[in-house]
UniProtKB/Swiss-Prot annotation:
Functional summary from the UniProt entry: Catalyzes the specific phosphorylation of 1,6-anhydro-N-acetylmuramic acid (anhMurNAc) with the simultaneous cleavage of the 1,6-anhydro ring, generating MurNAc-6-P. Is required for the utilization of anhMurNAc either imported from the medium or derived from its own cell wall murein, and thus plays a role in cell wall recycling.
EC number: 2.7.1.170
Protein's UniProt name: Anhydro-N-acetylmuramic acid kinase
Catalysis: reaction(s): 1,6-anhydro-N-acetyl-beta-muramate + ATP + H2O = N-acetyl-D-muramate 6-phosphate + ADP + H(+)
Organism the protein comes from: Bordetella parapertussis (strain 12822 / ATCC BAA-587 / NCTC 13253)
C-alpha cells in the first residue's frame, strides 16, 4: 500500500475496524476486519501471518538488555509495521474493501518490557509507518495511559470479554496466550481480571529447546511425559509473584526460559526428562489458573477459553482437571478463540475514537477509567 490510498472515506454501512495483535509467544500477527455497530462483532475477514524468523529472533533478543538497543528496537518496530501492513492488505482483499472503508486500525504492537511497578510499559510498534503504509488511521499505545493512572496496564481485554460473554450466571473467560489472564464475570458486579501466570511462553520455549519445533502441537510432546508433583510444587513455591493479590500483571520479563532453567537447576530431585518437564509446565498453567480463580472467591459456572492455548487439547484437559468445572473454547459461544484478542483491539480502537474510557480500575488498579490509546491519522 502507498500514499495513493489516502483520501476521503467511502460509505460502507456500519463502522468497520481492524484489530491487529502479536502476542507474547511472538509466533505471528493475527488480524480481523470487523463491523462493530451491532449487538455482536461481525467478522468480515481474518488473517494470521507468521512472524519472519529474523524479526522474531530480534524481538526475542530485545526482551533482554543488549548492545545498540535503541536502533535495533526502532528497526524491529518498522519490521513489525510492515508485517501488520501485509495483514491489513490481506484483510481488505478478502473483504473486497478499500482503506477508506475502515474507520481505524487498533494495533497492539509487541511487548518487550512491562514494568508497571516502575511506571512504564513498552510495546514496540511503528503506528505512524503503519498509517502511512495502510492509508488508515491507527490507534496504538493502549497500555501506557492506564499505567500513567497508576494501573497495571494489563490485562486490557476484560471489558471486551464482558461485552461479549456476560450473562445471567457467573463465568470466567480465560485467555491463553504467552501469559494466561482471566476475566471474572459475576452478575451485579463489575468485571474483575488479572494475569495468572505463564501459559505458552514456557511451553513454547521448552518445546523449541528440546524438539526444535516452535510450539507443542496438540500437546503431543507433553503427552509423552508425566507430571512431576515435586517439580510442580517447586515451580510454584519458588516464585513470589504467584502469591501476589490482584491487581497484577506479568510478562516475558519474568517468565522466560532463563526463569525455568534457574528453577530446574535449583530443584532438589533427580534430573527430569524433557517430556516430563513439558507435562509439568502444562499442569503449572492449569494449576495457577485454578489457584487464582479459587483465591478470588469467584464461583464461575463455566470457563470459556480463547487464545492459542485453546487449540491445545492437552492443556484444555489439564484445565478441566484442575478447575473441576466445564471448560470450553469461546467458539462454543460463537466467537472463534483464535481471534478474540485481535477483536478486542479493534473494539479498543473504536472506544478510543469515541473517547470512551476502556480501562477498568477493578482490573488494573488504576485510579479511574481512562481513554486508552493514541491516534495516528493516515
Amino acid at each position: 500500500m502507498d500514499s495513493t490510498t489516502h483520501g476521503p472515506r467511502t460509505h460502507v454501512p456500519g463502522r468497520l475496524f481492524i484489530g491487529l495483535m502479536s502476542g507474547t509467544s511472538m509466533d505471528g500477527a493475527d488480524g480481523v476486519l470487523v463491523r462493530l455497530d451491532g449487538p455482536r462483532p461481525e467478522v468480515l475477514a481474518s488473517a494470521s501471518l507468521p512472524m519472519p524468523a529474523a524479526l522474531r529472533d530480534e524481538l526475542f533478543a530485545l526482551n533482554h538488555a543488549g548492545a545498540n538497543e535503541l536502533e535495533r528496537a526502532a528497526l524491529a518496530a518498522n519490521g513489525l509495521a510492515r508485517l501488520y501492513a501485509r495483514a491489513v492488505r490481506q484483510l481488505l482483499d478478502q473483504a473486497g474493501l478499500q482503506p477508506g472503508d475502515v474507520a481505524a486500525i487498533g494495533a497492539h504492537g509487541q511487548t518487550v518490557r512491562h514494568r508497571p511497578d516502575l511506571g512504564y510499559t513498552l510495546q514496540l510498534n511503528a503506528p505512524a509507518l503503519l498509517a502511512e503504509l495502510a492509508g488508515i488511521d491507527v490507534v496504538a499505545d493502549f497500555r501506557s495511559r492506564d499505567v500513567a493512572a497508576g494501573g497495571q496496564g494489563a490485562p486490557l481485554v476484560p471489558p471486551f470479554h464482558a461485552a461479549l460473554f456476560a450473562g445471567g450466571q457467573a463465568r470466567a473467560v480465560l485467555n491463553l496466550g504467552g501469559i494466561a489472564n482471566v476475566t471474572l464475570l459475576e452478575p451485579g458486579r463489575p468485571p474483575r481480571g488479572f494475569d495468572t501466570g505463564p501459559a505458552n511462553v514456557l511451553l513454547d520455549a521448552w518445546c523449541q529447546r528440546h524438539t526444535g519445533q516452535p510450539y507443542d502441537a496438540d500437546g503431543r510432546f507433553a503427552a509423552q511425559g508425566q507430571v512431576l508433583a515435586g517439580l510442580l510444587e517447586h515451580l510454584i513455591a519458588s516464585e513470589p509473584w504467584f502469591a501476589l493479590a490482584p491487581p497484577k500483571s506479568t510478562g516475558r520479563d519474568l517468565f522466560n526460559l532463563d526463569w525455568l532453567l534457574a528453577r530446574l537447576q535449583a530443584f532438589d530431585g533427580p534430573a527430569p526428562q524433557p517430556q516430563d518437564v513439558q507435562a509439568t509446565l502444562q499442569r503449572l498453567t492449569a494449576r495457577t489458573v485454578a489457584n487464582a480463580i479459587d483465591a478470588s472467591a469467584a464461583a464461575p459456572r463455566d470457563v470459556l477459553v480463547c487464545g492459542g492455548g485453546a487449540r491445545n487439547p492437552g492443556l484444555m484437559r489439564e484445565l478441566a482437571y484442575c478447575l473441576q468445572r466445564p471448560v470450553h473454547p469461546t467458539d462454543d459461544a460463537g466467537v472463534p478463540a483464535q481471534w478474540v484478542e485481535a477483536l478486542a483491539f479493534a473494539w479498543l480502537a473504536q472506544a478510543c475514537l469515541d473517547r470512551i474510557p476502556a480501562g477498568l480500575p477493578t482490573v488494573t488498579g488504576a485510579r479511574a477509567a481512562r481513554v486508552l490509546g493514541a491516534l495516528y491519522p493516515a
